[in-house]
Amino acid sequence: MAIVIVATLVPVPEHRDAVIAALETAQGKAHAAEDGTLLYALHEGRDGRLVMIEKFADDAALAAHSAGGALAELVAALDGKLSAPMDVQVLTPHPAGLAAKGTL
């Protein structure tokens, strides 16, 4: 079963652009080098929060992502640039209705 993660980040206002750049760099590396990464999509909320929606093929793909250099580089690049700790939620789907519309 695929694993979906939502990571929410609140950048310090003066570091917003640097945080976005770091996330975009990590996004490109995940897309290019992680076969089991099915989705790694950055979005911005209307309140300025940044949300990375991630989907991994399985536990092994998530483990590879977690152990990869791109994530370590991202964590280092974000040091001191967030106003609160990153909120990471590992989600379990509860599909209803049409399967294609009820899960990520």
Model-inferred region functions:
Residues 20-21, 41:
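Short, 15-30-residue, compositionally biased linear elements
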